From Swiss-Prot:
SMART domains on file: PUG (SM00580), UBX (SM00166)
Free-text comment about domains: The UBX domain lacks key residues critical for VCP binding.
Species of provenance: Bos taurus
Regions of compositional bias (Basic and acidic residues) in chain numbering: 27-36
Domain of life of the source: Eukaryota
GO cellular component: centrosome; cytoplasm; cytosol; early endosome membrane; late endosome membrane; lysosomal membrane; membrane; nucleus
Region Mediates interaction with LMAN1: start-end pairs: 1-10
Region (VCP/p97-interacting motif (VIM)): 51-63
Domain UBX: 332-408
UniProt xrefs under CDD domains: PUB_UBXD1, UBX_UBXN6
Keyword annotations: Cytoplasm, Cytoskeleton, Endosome, Lysosome, Membrane, Nucleus, Ubl conjugation pathway
Protein name: UBX domain-containing protein 6
Length: 441
């Protein structure tokens, strides 16, 4: 059997070697005439012809049909696999990506951003207003906070405490301990012991020293690090001591404490990437980038196989609990959603949202784009389903992920009042600056 496949391979190589030659034919008669000044160009090795590939594939198929179905893997299976590997290796050398016997489909090429409904998911830094990619968020926010020390060291140190330290429980414990220190100073300004904090104190080390930004905070509100002698101890100890100038302004200390307690981590906000498109028959077609899916590359590939299994699941009797569990798993696949709203004139308003955001966020997004933001309106999903602004439902709970097309509808009573007043609704309800940047979908 091995000899059989070697003959197939030899036949493929023979047929790909080019046209035959006569033994009596001289080299000069065969070789093309070339200019003496130009070196001969080496021709690339030709891969197997389509006929040779089809012959090899047909031979493999005939052999597979002859094998008994009930038998497990045999030595001939190993031979076939080896032949496939060798043919693929030879095809790789000759530059032919579609060698016979290859079971691996070529990787799909990523489409350019010009074909995507949106180029990707982007974020806005709340401190600088810069537009950031997902992988830039942490580094750029850290950089912005550190730069803020030159203008407002107290605010910068508070942002550093709440943003750089990811363990929220540890941050709360440390912040509460600092607040307790400041409360003691505020309540007992005459007590010198409350104005000194021992750095090597166990509570300070376990709750405060381990947090980034705490030392900068103490220094920013008026503490100074000094070495003080300790009774019955040879060497001095390091303390934070509140300066007299800071002690004379107790209201400032109280304000800084409230800032520290009420602060939140600095997070980049999702950029809506608002766009307006002309009326289009492609309004319901969405080609989304990979950023919109909370899946790895392997999981995305597996989705195609799972879709074929969905047909089988529909024929199986499932309980309500089983269906709900499957729906929950489906919702968790998506992190973001791209929503389009078709306006009365047919134009499309598009924006990016978190899949977990509430429907009210979409209403606010649309209202910001209207010339008259007081106009009452409704948003209708596919099938005419009304989405209430007051409902506390997320987009993934409404089935509006990873993309959806909705319809804008003005309140019927408002339209009647406008017509009764002898006026007609505006041709477009969007702000002029948005219409000036309208695009073709």
């Amino acid at each position: 059997m091995k000899k059989f496949f070697q003959e197939i391979k030899a036949d493929i190589k023979f047929k790909s070697a080019g046209p035959g030659q006569k033994l009596t034919e001289s080299v000069g008669e065969k070789a093309p005439k070339e200019k003496p000044s130009q070196p001969p160009v080496r021709q690339p090795r030709q891969g197997p012809t389509n006929e040779a590939q089809m012959a090899a594939a047909a031979a493999l198929a005939r052999l597979e049909q002859k094998q008994p179905r009930a038998r497990g893997p045999t030595s001939q299976d190993s031979i076939r696999n080896q032949v496939r590997k060798e043919l693929r290796a030879e095809a790789a050398v000759s530059g032919d990506p579609e060698a016979p016997g290859s079971n691996t489909a070529p990787e799909p090429k990523e489409e350019g951003s010009a074909h995507l409904a949106v180029p990707g998911v982007y974020f806005t830094c709340p401190l600088t207003g810069a537009i950031l990619r997902k992988d830039q968020r942490d580094a750029r926010i850290r950089e912005a906070i550190l730069m803020h020390f030159s203008t407002d060291p107290v605010a910068a140190s508070i942002m550093k405490i709440h943003t750089f330290n990811k363990d929220r429980d540890r941050v709360k414990l440390g912040v509460d301990t600092i607040a307790k220190y400041l409360d003691n100073i505020h309540l007992h300004p005459e007590e010198e012991k409350y104005r000194k904090i021992k750095v090597q104190n166990k509570v300070f080390q376990e709750r405060i020293h381990c947090l980034e930004g705490t030392h900068e905070f103490f220094e920013a509100i008026g503490f100074q690090k000094v070495l003080l002698p300790i009774p019955d101890q040879e060497g001095p100890e390091e303390f934070y001591v509140l300066s007299e100038a800071a002690l004379a302004q107790p209201q400032s200390l109280e304000w800084h404490k409230e800032q520290l307690l009420s602060a939140e981590p600095v997070r980049a906000t999702l950029a809506r990437q608002r766009r307006v498109f002309r009326p289009s028959t492609l309004a319901s077609q969405f080609d989304l980038p990979a950023d919109f899916f909370n899946l790895t590359a392997e999981e995305i590939k597996r989705e195609q196989r799972l879709r074929s299994e969905a047909v089988e699941r529909l024929s199986v009797l499932r309980t309500k609990a089983m269906r709900e569990r499957e729906e929950q798993r489906e919702m968790r696949k998506y992190t973001y959603t791209l929503l389009r709203v078709r306006l009365p004139d047919g134009c499309l308003l598009q924006g990016t949202f978190y899949a977990r955001e509430r429907v009210a966020a979409l209403y606010g997004f649309v209202r910001e784009a209207l010339q008259n933001d007081w106009l009452p309106f409704e948003l209708l999903a596919s099938g005419g389903q009304k989405l209430s602004e007051d409902e506390n439902l997320a987009f993934n709970e409404c089935g509006l992920v990873p993309s959806a097309l909705l319809t804008f509808s003005l309140d019927a009573a408002v339209l009647e009042d406008i017509r009764a007043a002898g006026t007609q609704p505006d041709t477009s309800i969007l702000k002029p600056e948005l219409l000036s940047a309208i695009e073709k979908l």
